């Protein structure tokens, strides 16, 4: 066997291994970009040496075999994948090939869509009813996931409208948005459950649950992008019009779709999406470009594993391989000690990455990470870079275990890890310089006291020069002291003093949030303020009283009581609010007495879920609260009502499971109109 044949055999072996890891085990070992490079190399070798092409080559089929745990489903129309291009030159070559075949390349209309990073599925509707859902599998045979798909709120169980075919197979992508993914992992860390590396793995793992009740709790959503089988009916003759028809039937379709004439407009769309992808709220890895005319698609036909009339125009890689050179430990405002990996610098999604958070000891154990490992680093949009896997096959003999410190790396205080929690914390409190800095940065942040111009570097200097130890010290600073800071002139110093004075006028909710009570975010702070109305009432509240507040459970109640009972914190709060001293103040909070309100929401714990189209989420919360409702962020047995907007997901499913009444936005608006001031509606 010659050198080329040996390389072809090796590439096939490696690609098959990674196909199995990716498609079957949902545990990819290498980034997509590395897999794509290997596939491109094999394609090139087979193109140069066609005598080496075999029917079982990875270039001749779509993916790997499905798991046997689910019933297998044979696709009546194969689910093919797309060929990829990775730069503008390659895309233009694709466009030219099509233009040459059709003799009208510059005038050709393309339908451009987002390339979603989730799990491809097919949905079979008969007489408008969802009867079967399946994964792609190997393109010919997939897995029957109907029971799980039925739990995804974005997917209609019945199509609505006219001209619905007798049988139609809709194809699309199930994925998870960033917000839902982060909440899922937060809950997993809190309970010691499995933490997912990225939203794609979370979506795939959620659909492969044998128990649909687990899938129902996962924040999955769906966009459709094509059709497979079609019997007993007709669809429009353009891809764009088909998507619009799907939308009319109640199927979710992305609003980031554009018809482009010629390659120049396609490139403009690609660049625009690449620049704005971080604001989408979910992962994409490129743009899919399809010839819009179905007649022209038919003329162009297919190659072995992909259509000639479409291509995936991929973005620069968001995952890359690099080495862990060291691990250091940082201390946050609540004392949480976070391990940070120092990496061999590598370009990921156009940014040089040299650090990645490791979260906690459990995450290090889950990854099996050691210093010196070869790792996969991911950076998506503005998300902090993270290590999502290691390449065990490249682990050197010189690796060293990562050992958590027994004492705080900043102040030397003892560290502790409370049973049932994933986080290790410094016990030094505000004697720890790191905690002091982070607590002060939080106090002046935009969503807290909002001290304009008081940036992180200024706080660092104030603490290091020992000008400031508590939040109260900030308001004692003079312009003269400020001018002693780096890059701080008299005018800037005076502006900061004025900003601190302005920040004294705030709200009780902002003040409570600014204090940095553990696990008390903006929403919980607002609920505490609305429920108790004053600091005095909050200080007097026992655990039972705190548990009456929406979103406050036993753990949060304990954190609030512990913070308010701590003598140092009481001193700081007195200093900050003393009318004869610093005098931070806020308007009186009117506490709503549900018993005095004639409203269907009075005294009810209400949860909002999904997207609202008439009111904003904040407007809805304000209106509901004004009518006596307690607006909570999570569904539990204490929930009295769920208001479900569009694309409601796991909260709606949980409400249905618990038998909690559910109304839609229109019904909420009707009730608000009947029982409140309609001028704001």
Curated annotation (Swiss-Prot):
Residues holding NAD(+): 32-36, 81-82, 113, 136, 173, 290, 314
Residue intervals of the BRCT domain: 596-681
DNA repair as UniProt keyword: yes
Pfam families, sorted: BRCT, DNA_ligase_aden, DNA_ligase_OB, DNA_ligase_ZBD, HHH_2, HHH_5, Nlig-Ia
Keywords for the protein's UniProt record, in alphabetical order: DNA damage, DNA repair, DNA replication, Ligase, Magnesium, Manganese, Metal-binding, NAD, Zinc
EC number: 6.5.1.2
Top-level class of the enzyme under EC nomenclature: ligase
Residue positions of the active site: 115 (n6-amp-lysine intermediate)
Cofactor(s) annotated in UniProt: Mg(2+); Mn(2+)
One Gene Ontology term, aspect cellular component: cytosol
Catalytic activity: NAD(+) + (deoxyribonucleotide)n-3'-hydroxyl + 5'-phospho-(deoxyribonucleotide)m = (deoxyribonucleotide)n+m + AMP + beta-nicotinamide D-nucleotide
Positions of Zn(2+) binding: 408, 411, 426, 432
Keyword presence, Transport: no
Protein's GO biological process: DNA repair; DNA replication
GO molecular function: DNA binding; DNA ligase (NAD+) activity; metal ion binding
Record's function text: DNA ligase that catalyzes the formation of phosphodiester linkages between 5'-phosphoryl and 3'-hydroxyl groups in double-stranded DNA using NAD as a coenzyme and as the energy source for the reaction. It is essential for DNA replication and repair of damaged DNA.
Membership in a protein family: Belongs to the NAD-dependent DNA ligase family. LigA subfamily.
Protein name as annotated: DNA ligase
Species annotation: Pectobacterium atrosepticum (strain SCRI 1043 / ATCC BAA-672) (Erwinia carotovora subsp. atroseptica)
Gene name tied to this protein: ligA
């Amino acid at each position: 066997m010659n050198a080329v044949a040996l390389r072809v055999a090796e590439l096939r072996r490696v690609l098959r291994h990674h196909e199995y890891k990716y498609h079957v085990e949902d545990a990819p070992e290498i980034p997509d970009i590395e897999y794509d490079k290997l596939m491109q190399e094999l394609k090139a070798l087979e193109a140069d040496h066609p005598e080496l092409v075999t029917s079982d080559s990875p270039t001749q089929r779509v993916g790997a075999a499905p798991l046997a745990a689910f019933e297998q489903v044979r696709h009546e129309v194969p689910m093919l994948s797309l060929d990829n291009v990775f730069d503008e030159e390659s895309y233009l070559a694709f466009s030219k090939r099509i233009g040459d075949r059709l003799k009208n390349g510059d005038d050709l209309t393309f339908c451009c869509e987002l390339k979603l990073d989730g799990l491809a599925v097919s949905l079979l509707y008969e007489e408008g009813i969802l009867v079967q859902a399946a994964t792609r599998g190997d393109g010919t045979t997939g897995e029957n996931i109907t029971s799980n798909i039925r739990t995804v709120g974005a997917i209609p169980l019945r199509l609505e409208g006219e001209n619905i075919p007798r049988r139609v197979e809709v194809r699309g992508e199930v994925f998870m948005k960033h917000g839902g993914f982060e909440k899922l992992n937060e809950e997993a860390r809190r309970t010691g459950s499995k933490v997912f590396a990225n939203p794609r793995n979370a979506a795939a793992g959620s659909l492969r649950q044998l128990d649909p009740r687990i899938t129902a709790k996962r924040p999955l959503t769906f966009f459709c992008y094509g059709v497979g089988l079609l019997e007993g009916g007709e669809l429009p003759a353009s891809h764009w019009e088909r998507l619009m028809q799907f939308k009319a039937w109640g199927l979710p379709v992305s609003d980031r779709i554009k018809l482009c004439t010629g390659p120049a407009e396609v490139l403009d769309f690609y660049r625009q999406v690449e620049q704005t992808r971080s604001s989408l709220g979910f992962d994409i890895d490129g743009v899919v470009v399809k010839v819009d005319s179905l007649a022209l698609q038919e003329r162009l036909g297919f190659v072995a594993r992909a259509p000639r009339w479409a291509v995936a125009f991929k973005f620069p890689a968001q995952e890359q391989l690099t080495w862990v050179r060291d691990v250091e430990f940082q201390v946050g405002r609540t004392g949480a000690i976070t391990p940070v990996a120092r990496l061999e610098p590598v370009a990921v999604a156009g940014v040089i990455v040299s650090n990645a958070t490791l979260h906690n000891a459990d995450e290090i154990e889950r990854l099996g990470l050691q210093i010196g490992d070869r790792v996969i680093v991911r950076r998506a949009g503005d998300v902090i870079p993270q290590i999502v896997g290691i390449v065990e096959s490249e682990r050197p003999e010189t690796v060293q275990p990562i050992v958590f410190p027994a004492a705080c790396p900043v102040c030397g205080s003892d560290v502790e890890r409370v049973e049932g929690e994933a986080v290790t914390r410094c016990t030094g409190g505000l004697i720890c310089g790191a905690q002091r800095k982070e607590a002060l940065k939080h106090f002046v942040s935009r969503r807290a006291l909002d001290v304009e111009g008081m940036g992180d570097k200024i706080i660092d200097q104030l603490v290091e020069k020992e000008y400031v130890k508590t939040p109260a010290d900030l308001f004692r600073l003079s312009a003269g002291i400020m001018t002693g800071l780096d890059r701080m002139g008299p005018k800037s110093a005076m502006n900061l003093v004025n900003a601190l004075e302005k920040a004294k006028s705030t709200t009780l909710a902002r003040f409570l949030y600014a204090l940095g009570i553990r696990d008390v975010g903006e929403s919980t702070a607002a609920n505490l303020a609305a429920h108790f109305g004053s600091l005095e009432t909050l200080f007097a509240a026992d655990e039972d009283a705190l548990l009456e507040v929406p979103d406050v459970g036993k753990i949060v109640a304990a954190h609030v009581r512990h913070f308010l009972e701590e003598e140092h914190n009481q001193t700081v709060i007195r200093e900050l609010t003393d009318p004869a001293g610093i005098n931070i103040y806020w308007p009186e909070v009117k506490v709503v007495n549900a018993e005095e309100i004639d409203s269907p929401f009075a005294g009810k714990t209400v949860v909002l879920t999904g997207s609202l189209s008439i009111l904003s989420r904040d407007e809805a919360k304000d209106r509901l609260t004004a009518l006596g409702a307690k607006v909570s962020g999570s569904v539990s047995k204490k929930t009295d009502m769920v208001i479900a907007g569009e694309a409601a997901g796991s909260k709606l499913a949980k409400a249905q499971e618990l038998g909690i009444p559910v109304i839609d936005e229109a019904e909420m608006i009707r009730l608000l109109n009947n029982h409140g001031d309609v001028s704001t509606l």
